[in-house]
Amino acid sequence: AIAAVITFLILFTIFGNALVILAVLTSRSLRAPQNLFLVSLAAADILVATLIIPFSLANELLGYWYFRHMWCEVYLALDVLFCTSSIVHLCAISLDRYWAVSRALEYNSKRTPRRIKCIILTVWLIAAAISLPPLIYKGDQGPQPHGRPQCKLNQEAWYILSSSIGSFFAPCLIMILVYLRIYLIAKRSNRRGPRAKGATREGESKLPHPMAAGASASAKPPTLTSSLAVAGEANGHSKPTGEEGETLEDPVTSTLPPSWPALPNSDQGQKEGVCETSPEEDDEEEECGPQAVPVSPASAGSPPLQQPQGSRVLATLRGQVLLGRGVGAAGGQWWRRRTQLTREKRFTFVLAVVIGVFVLCWFPFFFSYSLGAICPQHCKVPHGLF
C-alpha cells in the first residue's frame, strides 16, 4: 500500500510540474521574467521525484541500501541539493513578491530575465554549497546493523546543525518576516484606498472651477474657445471650418472631463467673431470685429499661442491656459497601478498558502534531525518517526 501511494505521488509530481514548465514556456501571458522561478522550482521537484524518491522508497522497503556505495554518496548529495534548492527557491520567490509590492515602479524596471536568471543561479549555488560537504568529508557513518549496508546522512553535529539552518530554518525565517511585511503593506494600502478613491485626480485639480452659485450677477462664467479661433464670415454666423469646409468639433469642449457642465457654444448669440457681453450690457450694442479673438492683456500684441499636438487650451476672461497632454491621464495611471497591486497581492496570497503548507511538511523532519545533534543521548528520535 505504501509503495502504491508513493508511486502515485511520484507520477503526480512529475506530471504536475511538467505541466507548469510547459505552461510557462508556451503561454504568452505567463512569459513574465518572475515566472522563471516557477520553471526552476518545478525542475527541482521533478529531479526529486525521479532521482531521490524511488531510491529512498527502495531503501525503506528493503531495510538496507541495495545499490552501490558510490551511488549512496551521490544520492545523499543530490537529496540535499534538490531539497535545499526547492526551499531556497521559495525564499527567493517571497523576496521577489516583497520587492514587487513595496517598490513596484523601481523593481519592475529592474526585473529583467537576466536578473532573474542570476538570482536562480545564486539559489542553486547556495544549495550546492550545502550539499557538497558530505562528498568531501564523510564522517562517522555509525554501526551497520546485521552487517547490511546503510545509506544515511552525515551524522556529524556540526554538519547537521549547519545544513539544517542553511536548508530550512534561515529560509523559513526570511519567508515569515517577508510575508509579515507584505501583510502590513497590504493592510496600510487598504486603509488608504477609500481616501485615494475620493481624492481629486492629479491634473484636473489644476483646471479652473465653474463659479459657485450666489456669485455676483455681473460675474461672467468662463468661456471655452479653441486657441485657433477662426473669425466668422461677414454675413451670418458660422463655425470654424477645415480646409475642405467640413465643420470641426471644438477641441476643448470635446476633451473636457465628464464632471464639467456643458457650457454654451462660443458661436451662439455672437456675431462675426468670438465675443460675449455680461448681463448688464445686454441693452447696449457692442460690435465685434470680424477678426476678434479673446486673448489676455499680457499676451496682446504677441504671437498667437501655439497648441502642441495632444494638448488642450482653456481660454477665460483672464487669458488662455495651456493644458499639457498629461492632464487627465493621472487617473488612468492610478487605476493601472491599483490593478497591478491587486494582482500582486492575490498572487502573493496564493504563494503564502503554498509556502505555508511546504513549511509544515518540512518542519517535522528538520526538527527531529536537528534534535538528534543537539542532545543525542537524551533526545532519541524513534527511527519510524524519523
UniProtKB/Swiss-Prot annotation:
<dbReference type="InterPro" id="IPR000207">
    <property type="entry name" value="ADRA2B_rcpt"/>
</dbReference>
<feature type="topological domain" description="Extracellular">
    <location>
        <begin position="63"/>
        <end position="72"/>
    </location>
</feature>
<feature type="transmembrane region" description="Helical; Name=7">
    <location>
        <begin position="384"/>
        <end position="386"/>
    </location>
</feature>
<feature type="topological domain" description="Cytoplasmic">
    <location>
        <begin position="26"/>
        <end position="36"/>
    </location>
</feature>
<dbReference type="GO" id="GO:0019229">
    <property type="term" value="P:regulation of vasoconstriction"/>
</dbReference>
<keyword id="KW-0564">Palmitate</keyword>
<dbReference type="GO" id="GO:0009986">
    <property type="term" value="C:cell surface"/>
</dbReference>
<keyword id="KW-0449">Lipoprotein</keyword>
<keyword id="KW-0297">G-protein coupled receptor</keyword>
<comment type="similarity">
    <text>Belongs to the G-protein coupled receptor 1 family. Adrenergic receptor subfamily. ADRA2B sub-subfamily.</text>
</comment>
<dbReference type="GO" id="GO:0051379">
    <property type="term" value="F:epinephrine binding"/>
</dbReference>
<keyword id="KW-1015">Disulfide bond</keyword>
<feature type="transmembrane region" description="Helical; Name=3">
    <location>
        <begin position="73"/>
        <end position="95"/>
    </location>
</feature>
<feature type="topological domain" description="Cytoplasmic">
    <location>
        <begin position="96"/>
        <end position="117"/>
    </location>
</feature>
<dbReference type="GO" id="GO:0006940">
    <property type="term" value="P:regulation of smooth muscle contraction"/>
</dbReference>
<feature type="transmembrane region" description="Helical; Name=6">
    <location>
        <begin position="351"/>
        <end position="374"/>
    </location>
</feature>
<dbReference type="InterPro" id="IPR000276">
    <property type="entry name" value="GPCR_Rhodpsn"/>
</dbReference>
<feature type="transmembrane region" description="Helical; Name=1">
    <location>
        <begin position="1"/>
        <end position="25"/>
    </location>
</feature>
<keyword id="KW-0675">Receptor</keyword>
<feature type="compositionally biased region" description="Low complexity">
    <location>
        <begin position="289"/>
        <end position="304"/>
    </location>
</feature>
<feature type="site" description="Implicated in catechol agonist binding">
    <location>
        <position position="167"/>
    </location>
</feature>
<protein>
    <recommendedName>
        <fullName>Alpha-2B adrenergic receptor</fullName>
    </recommendedName>
</protein>
<keyword id="KW-1003">Cell membrane</keyword>
<dbReference type="GO" id="GO:0030168">
    <property type="term" value="P:platelet activation"/>
</dbReference>
<keyword id="KW-0812">Transmembrane</keyword>
<feature type="topological domain" description="Extracellular">
    <location>
        <begin position="375"/>
        <end position="383"/>
    </location>
</feature>
<feature type="region of interest" description="Disordered">
    <location>
        <begin position="193"/>
        <end position="310"/>
    </location>
</feature>
<feature type="topological domain" description="Extracellular">
    <location>
        <begin position="141"/>
        <end position="156"/>
    </location>
</feature>
<feature type="transmembrane region" description="Helical; Name=4">
    <location>
        <begin position="118"/>
        <end position="140"/>
    </location>
</feature>
<keyword id="KW-1133">Transmembrane helix</keyword>
<comment type="subunit">
    <text>Interacts with RAB26. Interacts with PPP1R9B. Interacts with GGA1, GGA2 and GGA3.</text>
</comment>
<dbReference type="InterPro" id="IPR017452">
    <property type="entry name" value="GPCR_Rhodpsn_7TM"/>
</dbReference>
<feature type="transmembrane region" description="Helical; Name=2">
    <location>
        <begin position="37"/>
        <end position="62"/>
    </location>
</feature>
<comment type="function">
    <text>Alpha-2 adrenergic receptors mediate the catecholamine-induced inhibition of adenylate cyclase through the action of G proteins.</text>
</comment>
<keyword id="KW-0807">Transducer</keyword>
<feature type="transmembrane region" description="Helical; Name=5">
    <location>
        <begin position="157"/>
        <end position="180"/>
    </location>
</feature>
<feature type="site" description="Implicated in catechol agonist binding">
    <location>
        <position position="163"/>
    </location>
</feature>
<dbReference type="GO" id="GO:0004938">
    <property type="term" value="F:alpha2-adrenergic receptor activity"/>
</dbReference>
<feature type="site" description="Implicated in ligand binding">
    <location>
        <position position="79"/>
    </location>
</feature>
<dbReference type="GO" id="GO:0005886">
    <property type="term" value="C:plasma membrane"/>
</dbReference>
<feature type="compositionally biased region" description="Acidic residues">
    <location>
        <begin position="278"/>
        <end position="288"/>
    </location>
</feature>
<feature type="topological domain" description="Cytoplasmic">
    <location>
        <begin position="181"/>
        <end position="350"/>
    </location>
</feature>
